[in-house]
């Protein structure tokens, strides 16, 4: 089961980028298989997005192109955007005209061989367009993160 929280996890590398205008965290406990690494999680979410995520990104790119915002596939947008990493976490970030965001992919071991996978997002608005943009994106963001974790 995927759970939602609005706080950055304790000791997350993402904490150094706070404060933010928006924060969410989704997590899921997984067990009965090899541990997932942050790199594997990044690959699963961004390199092989769901058909829905791919379709929404194509629509987003069409809608934002007139505003001069960065466009491209999820994979293209996160390539070479790793801000920091540890053996259990990767933080990916991107700054555009309208907003700055970072996503943490945290894979924390738990007792009994299980693992807590947490995807945390923080957003900072660079200007009013960022706030308006994220108002429309937020429901889809929440849906897509939840679905990505449910597939694990």
Feature-to-residue mapping (PLM):
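Hydrophobic-ligand binding "helix-grip"
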Residues: 72-111
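Short C-terminal domain-edge/linker segments immediately following a structured domain
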Residues: 57-61, 121-125, 148-152
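Low-complexity, charge- and small-residue-enriched intrinsically disordered regions
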Residues: 1, 68-77, 143-149
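Hydrophobic ligand-binding cavity/cleft-lining segments
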Residues: 1-67
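Intrinsic-disorder/low-complexity, polar/charged segments enriched in Ser/Thr/Lys/Arg/Asp/Glu/Gln
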Residues: 23-27, 89, 116-118
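Beta-strand/loop substructures that line and gate deep hydrophobic ligand-binding cavities in soluble
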Residues: 97-135
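A conserved amphipathic terminal alpha-helix motif
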Residues: 133-152
């Amino acid at each position: 089961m995927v759970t939602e929280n609005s706080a950055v996890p304790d000791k997350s590398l993402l904490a150094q980028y706070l404060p933010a205008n928006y924060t969410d965290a989704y997590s899921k406990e997984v067990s009965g298989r090899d541990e997932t690494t942050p790199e594997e999680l990044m690959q699963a979410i961004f390199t092989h997005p769901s058909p829905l995520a791919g379709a929404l990104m194509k629509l987003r790119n069409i809608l934002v192109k007139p505003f001069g915002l960065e466009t491209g596939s999820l994979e293209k947008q996160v390539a070479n955007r790793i801000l920091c990493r540890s053996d259990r976490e990767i933080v990916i970030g991107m700054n555009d005209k309208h907003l700055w965001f970072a996503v943490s992919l945290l894979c924390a071991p738990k007792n009994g061989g299980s693992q807590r996978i947490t995807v945390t997002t923080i957003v900072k608005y660079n200007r009013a367009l960022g706030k308006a943009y994220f108002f429309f994106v937020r429901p889809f963001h929440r849906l897509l993160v939840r679905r990505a974790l449910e597939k694990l």
